[in-house]
Structures are given as C-alpha cells and as structure tokens.
C-alpha cells in the first residue's frame, strides 16, 4: 500500500505526514513531495520514528517519482489563508497548482484514489475532475474533496456545548467546504437536541471555524494541525477500504447524481475501488432544508468556476 502526499513540506502536509508515518499499516510506503527543497529532509526527519512505514521524500518541479505506484494520493499543496482572505481568494494561486499536480497524477497513477485538501475545495475538486476527464482517466468514484475537518470541528463543538465525550459524537456534514455551503446536520446527532438559537449559532461557528483559527493565529497561519488530523483520518479510511475492510463510511465532497449540485458532500460507503455507495442525506429539519436550498447557488458558482478554469 503506497500513500503519496503532494504538498508535504507545508503546515498541513507535515502534520499529515507525521500522522501517516505513525498510523499507516505496517509495511506501507509513504512518499512525500513538495516543490520546496526541504522535502527530502522532512522524510529523513520522519524516518527516525521507529514504525514499519517506509518513507521517501522528493522535491523540485516533477512529482512523478513520488507518484509512481501510488494507491492513494493526498493533495495539500498551495498557499494558505491569511487574515482578511476567504477560501475563494486562494483560487487565483491554488487552481494552477492543482491542475499541474493532477496532470501528473493522471499520467503516473491514474487508478489512485485522490483526496483533495487544497482550498477552495468546492472549486479545486471540479478542476481535478475536468483535468482527469481531459486525460481520459476520470472515475468519479476515485476523486474526493476532503471535508473531514468540518466533521471533526462539528464533533468537537457539539461535545463542548453538550458536555459529551467528543469520541462519541458523530455529526454528518453535507454540502461543500466553505462558508454557507458547509451544512452540519445537527438534527441527526443521536441523543442530543438543540434549540433554534443553538442550532443557528453552532452552524455559524462550524461554517466560520477556519476564520476563527486564522484570526487566532494573528497572521501566523491557518488551520494546519486540525486539518492534518482530518486528512489523516480520511486517508486512513481510504487505506482501510482498499485493504477490504467492510463498512468504512465517511463524508466527502464528490460527484454524485447531481440531485443538489454536480459535486456535493454526503456520507459515502468506501471500498476497494473507491466509492461503493453514495448514501442519502436523510431527513432534514426545516432549518437544514432552508440552509440547503439557500447555499446551492453559491456551491454551483464555485463548481462552474473550476470547470471553466480547465476549458
């Protein structure tokens, strides 16, 4: 089993690489790539951690050596948010980075499961899909926008508000991965109820949690450690599914049947070829139904922006 991290020298990439080095199954290979010359050194640093995960690091313009034989590719390359920026401001820089890396994935390991972390995810996943399609290798069951950070944040915030053990809380989050497109389904959390005011303020906090971190870091970065954990959780779920474990379920932003938008985050059953089944979002409260219909225009615009970038 080989996992490749593209963008491995950044804040998210290094946190993700550390978690994978300590949590991937014994005998796995972990390959790190970044344009930054420090990347082989990150691999050397991690190689001193005594786990049975073989590690290698590559830098420069060409990601091919890192991608050869990859089963899972996790992409965190790009610039991070700074105060005053929203995820869409990142588009101008990150769109080109994702296009370039996906072209290399298409040429080197077209059958790999691909997880996109690079923001704006609503748009970068559409870019990746169009690039893969142009290369004739697109399989919508193998491409994922990683929205797990919204889920772990929702779990943490609900546990804090309701005095629950965070490990026991599981909040489904649907829609997209920025601002109003993030929709936590608080009505579906078992054993917990929320009044209208709690629902509204908690939903808003989950939607704006990225900004909370950017502002708290006072210009010193964005959410790197929690995102590294979220990406590791999702990447490890893909690995478990590839190894044949049954009942691996995670939410992610994927191309579906287009019921709400071409790409949409929903619960997925994962298997050896990626997505086995897109699970329905279930029954929504009136608040959630309204939030869903209100966000769709924004989500569709984000998707169109990505599609048009590749044309």
From Swiss-Prot:
UniProt superkingdom: Bacteria
Residue numbers binding substrate: 81, 87, 119, 153
Pfam (any one): Ldh_1_C
Enzymatic reactions: (S)-malate + NAD(+) = oxaloacetate + NADH + H(+)
Top enzyme category: oxidoreductase
InterPro entries named in the record: L-lactate/malate_DH (IPR001557), Lactate/malate_DH_C (IPR022383), Lactate/malate_DH_N (IPR001236), Lactate_DH/Glyco_Ohase_4_C (IPR015955), Malate_DH_AS (IPR001252), Malate_DH_type1 (IPR010097), Malate_DH_type1_bac (IPR023958), NAD(P)-bd_dom_sf (IPR036291)
A Gene Ontology BP annotation from the UniProt entry: tricarboxylic acid cycle
Positions that bind NAD(+): 7-13, 34, 94, 117-119, 227
EC number per UniProt: 1.1.1.37
Gene Ontology terms: cellular component: cytoplasm
Record family assignment: Belongs to the LDH/MDH superfamily. MDH type 1 family.
Complex formation: Homodimer.
PANTHER family tied to this protein: MALATE AND LACTATE DEHYDROGENASE (PTHR11540), MALATE DEHYDROGENASE, MITOCHONDRIAL (PTHR11540:SF16)
Descriptive protein name: Malate dehydrogenase
């Amino acid at each position: 089993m080989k996992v490749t991290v593209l963008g491995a020298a950044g804040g998210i990439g290094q946190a993700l690489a550390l978690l994978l080095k300590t949590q991937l199954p014994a005998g796995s290979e972990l390959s790190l790539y970044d344009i930054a010359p420090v990347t082989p050194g990150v691999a050397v640093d991690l190689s001193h951690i005594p786990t049975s995960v073989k590690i290698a690091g590559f830098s420069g313009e060409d990601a091919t050596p890192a991608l050869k034989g990859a089963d899972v590719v996790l992409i965190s390359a790009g610039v991070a948010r700074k105060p005053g920026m929203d995820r869409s401001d990142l588009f101008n820089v990150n769109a080109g980075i994702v296009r370039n890396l996906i072209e290399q994935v298409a040429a080197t390991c077209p059958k790999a499961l691909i997880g996109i972390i690079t923001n704006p995810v609503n748009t970068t996943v559409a870019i990746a899909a169009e690039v893969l399609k142009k290369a004739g290798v697109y399989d919508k069951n193998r491409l994922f926008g990683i929205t797990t950070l919204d889920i772990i944040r929702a779990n943490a915030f609900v546990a804090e508000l309701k005095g629950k053990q965070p490990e026991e809380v599981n909040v489904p989050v649907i829609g997209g991965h920025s601002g109003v497109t993030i929709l936590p389904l608080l009505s579906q959390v078992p054993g917990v109820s929320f009044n209208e005011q709690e629902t509204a303020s908690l939903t808003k906090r989950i939607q704006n949690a990225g900004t909370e971190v950017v502002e708290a870091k006072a210009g010193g970065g964005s959410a790197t450690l929690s995102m590294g954990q979220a990406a590791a959780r999702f990447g490890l779920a893909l690995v478990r599914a590839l190894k044949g474990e049954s009942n691996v379920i995670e939410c992610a932003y994927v191309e579906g049947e287009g019921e709400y938008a071409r790409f949409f985050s929903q619960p997925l059953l994962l298997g050896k070829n990626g997505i086995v089944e897109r699970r329905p979002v279930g029954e929504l409260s009136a608040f959630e139904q309204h939030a869903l219909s209100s966000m769709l225009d924004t989500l569709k615009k984000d998707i169109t922006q990505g599609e048009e970038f590749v044309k």
